[in-house]
Protein backbone atom coordinates (compact mmCIF):
# COMPACT_ATOMS: atom_id res chain seq x y z
CA UNK A 1 0.00 0.00 0.00
CA UNK A 2 1.00 3.58 -0.51
CA UNK A 3 2.23 5.30 2.66
CA UNK A 4 -0.61 7.83 2.47
CA UNK A 5 -3.02 5.04 3.39
CA UNK A 6 -1.18 3.97 6.54
CA UNK A 7 -1.88 5.46 9.94
CA UNK A 8 1.65 5.63 11.32
CA UNK A 9 0.31 6.74 14.70
CA UNK A 10 -1.50 3.44 15.20
CA UNK A 11 0.32 1.68 18.06
CA UNK A 12 1.59 -1.44 16.30
CA UNK A 13 5.05 -2.97 16.20
CA UNK A 14 7.02 -4.22 13.22
CA UNK A 15 6.54 -7.92 13.95
CA UNK A 16 2.79 -7.40 14.47
CA UNK A 17 2.44 -5.65 11.10
CA UNK A 18 4.27 -8.48 9.36
CA UNK A 19 2.20 -11.16 11.10
CA UNK A 20 -0.98 -9.39 10.00
CA UNK A 21 -0.13 -10.64 6.51
CA UNK A 22 -1.25 -14.14 7.49
CA UNK A 23 -4.38 -13.24 9.49
CA UNK A 24 -6.53 -14.54 6.66
CA UNK A 25 -5.07 -17.99 7.34
CA UNK A 26 -4.83 -17.93 11.14
CA UNK A 27 -7.67 -15.56 12.05
CA UNK A 28 -7.60 -12.25 13.88
CA UNK A 29 -7.69 -13.44 17.46
CA UNK A 30 -5.58 -16.59 17.28
CA UNK A 31 -1.91 -16.86 18.06
CA UNK A 32 0.56 -17.52 15.31
CA UNK A 33 1.70 -21.12 15.06
CA UNK A 34 5.31 -22.28 15.01
CA UNK A 35 5.11 -22.28 11.20
CA UNK A 36 4.03 -18.62 11.05
CA UNK A 37 6.59 -17.59 13.67
CA UNK A 38 9.33 -19.37 11.73
CA UNK A 39 8.31 -17.59 8.53
CA UNK A 40 8.16 -14.27 10.41
CA UNK A 41 11.68 -14.79 11.74
CA UNK A 42 12.94 -15.75 8.27
CA UNK A 43 11.46 -12.60 6.72
CA UNK A 44 12.81 -10.43 9.54
CA UNK A 45 16.23 -11.94 8.88
CA UNK A 46 16.07 -11.80 5.06
CA UNK A 47 14.96 -8.17 5.01
CA UNK A 48 17.26 -7.23 7.92
CA UNK A 49 14.47 -6.12 10.21
CA UNK A 50 15.19 -8.35 13.18
CA UNK A 51 16.88 -5.60 15.19
CA UNK A 52 13.75 -3.41 14.93
CA UNK A 53 11.10 -6.11 15.32
CA UNK A 54 9.69 -4.52 18.51
CA UNK A 55 9.83 -0.94 17.27
CA UNK A 56 6.63 1.05 16.59
CA UNK A 57 6.03 1.65 12.87
CA UNK A 58 5.97 5.43 13.44
CA UNK A 59 9.68 5.22 14.35
CA UNK A 60 10.78 3.64 11.06
CA UNK A 61 12.60 5.20 8.14
CA UNK A 62 10.98 5.06 4.71
CA UNK A 63 13.13 2.13 3.64
CA UNK A 64 12.45 0.20 6.84
CA UNK A 65 8.70 0.75 6.52
CA UNK A 66 8.72 -0.41 2.91
CA UNK A 67 10.63 -3.57 3.89
CA UNK A 68 8.06 -4.21 6.64
CA UNK A 69 5.20 -3.84 4.13
CA UNK A 70 6.89 -6.19 1.67
CA UNK A 71 7.46 -8.71 4.47
CA UNK A 72 3.78 -8.42 5.40
CA UNK A 73 2.76 -9.24 1.82
CA UNK A 74 5.15 -12.19 1.76
CA UNK A 75 3.69 -13.70 4.94
CA UNK A 76 0.90 -15.15 2.85
CA UNK A 77 1.65 -18.37 1.01
CA UNK A 78 0.61 -16.99 -2.34
CA UNK A 79 1.66 -18.14 -5.78
CA UNK A 80 1.22 -14.61 -7.09
CA UNK A 81 2.39 -11.38 -5.44
CA UNK A 82 1.45 -7.89 -6.65
CA UNK A 83 3.69 -5.10 -5.41
CA UNK A 84 2.81 -1.48 -6.12
CA UNK A 85 5.94 0.67 -6.44
CA UNK A 86 8.00 -1.21 -3.82
CA UNK A 87 11.14 0.85 -4.59
CA UNK A 88 9.73 4.38 -4.46
CA UNK A 89 11.27 6.70 -1.90
CA UNK A 90 13.61 4.16 -0.33
CA UNK A 91 17.37 3.90 0.04
CA UNK A 92 19.44 1.75 -2.31
CA UNK A 93 20.20 -0.74 0.48
CA UNK A 94 16.50 -1.42 1.13
CA UNK A 95 15.91 -1.66 -2.61
CA UNK A 96 18.63 -4.31 -2.93
CA UNK A 97 17.28 -6.32 0.02
CA UNK A 98 13.75 -6.30 -1.38
CA UNK A 99 14.98 -7.24 -4.86
CA UNK A 100 17.06 -10.11 -3.46
CA UNK A 101 13.95 -11.50 -1.74
CA UNK A 102 11.86 -11.04 -4.89
CA UNK A 103 14.44 -12.92 -6.97
CA UNK A 104 14.43 -15.73 -4.41
CA UNK A 105 10.64 -16.00 -4.68
CA UNK A 106 10.84 -16.01 -8.46
CA UNK A 107 13.32 -18.90 -8.32
CA UNK A 108 10.80 -20.74 -6.13
CA UNK A 109 8.28 -20.50 -8.99
CA UNK A 110 6.26 -17.57 -7.65
CA UNK A 111 4.82 -14.97 -10.02
CA UNK A 112 5.76 -11.45 -8.98
CA UNK A 113 3.92 -8.53 -10.58
CA UNK A 114 5.48 -5.16 -9.85
CA UNK A 115 4.21 -1.71 -10.78
CA UNK A 116 7.38 0.22 -11.53
CA UNK A 117 7.90 3.51 -13.37
CA UNK A 118 11.69 3.93 -13.21
CA UNK A 119 13.14 2.17 -16.24
CA UNK A 120 16.79 2.84 -15.29
CA UNK A 121 17.22 -0.51 -13.51
CA UNK A 122 14.48 -2.49 -15.22
CA UNK A 123 16.96 -4.54 -17.22
CA UNK A 124 18.68 -5.61 -13.98
CA UNK A 125 15.48 -6.45 -12.12
CA UNK A 126 12.91 -7.84 -14.53
CA UNK A 127 12.95 -10.62 -17.11
CA UNK A 128 9.65 -9.57 -18.71
CA UNK A 129 7.95 -6.19 -18.97
CA UNK A 130 4.41 -5.14 -19.68
CA UNK A 131 4.10 -1.64 -21.14
CA UNK A 132 0.82 0.22 -20.65
CA UNK A 133 -0.40 3.48 -22.08
CA UNK A 134 -4.21 3.59 -21.94
CA UNK A 135 -4.09 -0.09 -22.92
CA UNK A 136 -1.63 -2.95 -23.30
CA UNK A 137 1.12 -1.83 -25.66
CA UNK A 138 3.66 -4.63 -25.19
CA UNK A 139 4.32 -7.75 -23.15
CA UNK A 140 7.59 -9.57 -23.58
CA UNK A 141 11.30 -9.78 -22.86
CA UNK A 142 12.89 -6.86 -21.05
CA UNK A 143 15.47 -6.18 -23.75
CA UNK A 144 12.77 -5.81 -26.40
CA UNK A 145 10.52 -3.73 -24.12
CA UNK A 146 13.32 -1.28 -23.39
CA UNK A 147 14.34 -0.75 -27.00
CA UNK A 148 14.17 2.86 -28.17
CA UNK A 149 11.68 1.93 -30.85
CA UNK A 150 9.32 0.21 -28.39
CA UNK A 151 9.51 2.99 -25.79
CA UNK A 152 8.98 5.69 -28.41
CA UNK A 153 6.01 3.84 -29.88
CA UNK A 154 4.49 3.41 -26.42
CA UNK A 155 5.11 6.76 -24.80
CA UNK A 156 6.25 9.35 -27.35
CA UNK A 157 4.46 8.59 -30.61
CA UNK A 158 1.46 6.92 -28.98
CA UNK A 159 -1.93 7.65 -30.53
CA UNK A 160 -5.10 6.39 -28.93
CA UNK A 161 -7.45 5.86 -31.87
CA UNK A 162 -10.36 5.23 -29.52
CA UNK A 163 -10.05 8.79 -28.20
CA UNK A 164 -10.01 10.14 -31.75
CA UNK A 165 -13.09 8.08 -32.56
CA UNK A 166 -14.90 9.28 -29.46
CA UNK A 167 -14.08 12.92 -30.11
CA UNK A 168 -15.14 12.71 -33.76
CA UNK A 169 -18.46 11.06 -32.80
CA UNK A 170 -19.16 13.78 -30.27
CA UNK A 171 -18.34 16.53 -32.74
CA UNK A 172 -21.16 18.70 -34.11
CA UNK A 173 -19.15 19.65 -37.21
Give a label for each model feature.
Residues 19, 34-52:
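Conserved ABC ATPase "signature" region
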Residues 143-173:
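ABC ATPase nucleotide-binding domains
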Residues 116-117:
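H-loop/switch region of ABC-family ATPase nucleotide-binding domains
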Residues 56-60, 64:
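Conserved ABC ATPase signature
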Residues 129-142:
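H-loop (His-switch) and adjacent beta-strand-loop-beta switch element
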Residues 92-94:
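Helix N-cap at the start of a conserved alpha-helix in ABC-type nucleotide-binding domains
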Residues 81-84:
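Catalytic Walker B motif of ABC-type/P-loop ATPase nucleotide-binding domains
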Amino acid sequence: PQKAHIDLDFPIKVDQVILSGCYEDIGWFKKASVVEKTKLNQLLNDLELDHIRHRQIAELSGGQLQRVLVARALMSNSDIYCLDEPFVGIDIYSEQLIMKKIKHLRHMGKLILIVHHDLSKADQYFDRILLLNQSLQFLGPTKEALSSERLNATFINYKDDSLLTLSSQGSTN
